[in-house]
């Protein structure tokens, strides 16, 4: 069994080897992906992939705590990051209160917060109170309404400069790593080179310090929509449907159960 990652080992990976981060929402999948992942992200994406909602905004703190504990049961040797859901860190006091609640009631090793310079003060406040924080810059799913949709960042020089400012502000605030999402590859590479902490990409090219994907996307289980940045490593939906049809057919023809399945 591989040694569990720590804040220190995550930071030291910068420039040595890319970090592998995968999302999980339950014990079953957490157990399956643990051997391959350096870190498991319990993302608020569960509101879409698991709960079937249209976006992440209605995910609650209670949901995140519940699923973080489920993941921890299945992946006892993994570094687990819990997403802080929309509306739980709008100011210093609420952010600290809600972060403490997650730490006290779940097995999270760290929390992830969306935002750049605008969230640096809150991140600093959390870090100074013993909360490990992973940042998240670029395309921010929790801000899709105010942004007018999910828009790729880094297309203009102004956006490039702001992304670098965001990354440096998060690093200075005390974050141990950050996710960069939906950013032009060349700009994401510049952002990663501008800071000393790992920058983990999703839809941000290969020249960053690691990658993260949603497990149901990469396994081909989510059929409704596949983002451009997702590679399907398995046609999971087709395989599952085929297996379920075989089961249904065998039940209807009484081919199942056979003697070996009977007491």
Swiss-Prot record:
Which catalytic reaction applies to this protein?
Answer: 3-methyl-2-oxobutanoate + (6R)-5,10-methylene-5,6,7,8-tetrahydrofolate + H2O = 2-dehydropantoate + (6S)-5,6,7,8-tetrahydrofolate
Sites binding 3-methyl-2-oxobutanoate sit at 44-45, 83, 112
* InterPro entries associated with the record: Pantoate_hydroxy_MeTrfase, Pyrv/PenolPyrv_kinase-like_dom, Pyrv_kinase-like_dom_sf
Which sites bind Mg(2+)? 44, 83, 114
Q: How is the cofactor bound?
A: Binds 1 Mg(2+) ion per subunit.
Task: Report the active site residues.
Answer: 181
What are the protein's GO molecular function terms?
3-methyl-2-oxobutanoate hydroxymethyltransferase activity; magnesium ion binding
Provide the assembly information. Answer: Homodecamer; pentamer of dimers.
Known role? Catalyzes the reversible reaction in which hydroxymethyl group from 5,10-methylenetetrahydrofolate is transferred onto alpha-ketoisovalerate to form ketopantoate.
Q: Know the name of this protein?
A: 3-methyl-2-oxobutanoate hydroxymethyltransferase
Q: Which organism is it from?
A: Sulfurimonas denitrificans (strain ATCC 33889 / DSM 1251) (Thiomicrospira denitrificans (strain ATCC 33889 / DSM 1251))
- Name the encoding gene, please: panB
């Amino acid at each position: 069994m591989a040694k569990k990652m720590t804040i220190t080992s995550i930071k030291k990976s910068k420039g040595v080897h890319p970090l592998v981060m995968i999302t999980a929402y339950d014990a079953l999948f957490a157990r399956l992906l643990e051997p391959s992942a350096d870190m498991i992200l319990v993302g608020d994406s569960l509101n879409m992939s698991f709960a079937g909602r249209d976006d992440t905004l209605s995910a609650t703190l209670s949901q995140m705590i519940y699923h973080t504990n489920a993941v921890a049961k299945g992946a006892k040797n993994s570094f687990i990051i819990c997403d802080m859901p929309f509306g739980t860190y709008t100011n210093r006091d609420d952010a600290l209160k809600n972060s403490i609640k997650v730490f006290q009631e779940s097995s999270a090793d760290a929390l992830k917060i969306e935002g750049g310079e605008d969230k640096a003060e809150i991140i600093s406040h959390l870090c100074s109170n013993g909360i490990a924080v992973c940042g998240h810059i670029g395309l921010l799913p929790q801000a899709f309404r105010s942004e007018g949709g999910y828009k790729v960042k880094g297309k203009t020089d102004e956006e490039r400069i702001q992304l670098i400012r965001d990354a440096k502000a998060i690093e200075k605030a005390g974050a141990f790593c950050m996710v960069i999402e939906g950013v032009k590859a060349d700009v994401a590479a510049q952002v990663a080179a501008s800071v000393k902490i790992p920058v983990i990409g999703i839809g941000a090219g290969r020249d960053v310090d690691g990658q993260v994907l949603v497990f149901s996307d990469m396994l081909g289980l989510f059929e409704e929509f596949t983002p451009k940045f997702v590679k399907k490593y398995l046609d999971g939906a087709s395989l599952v449907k085929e297996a379920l049809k075989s089961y249904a057919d065998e039940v209807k023809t009484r081919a199942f159960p056979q003697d070996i399945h009977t007491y």
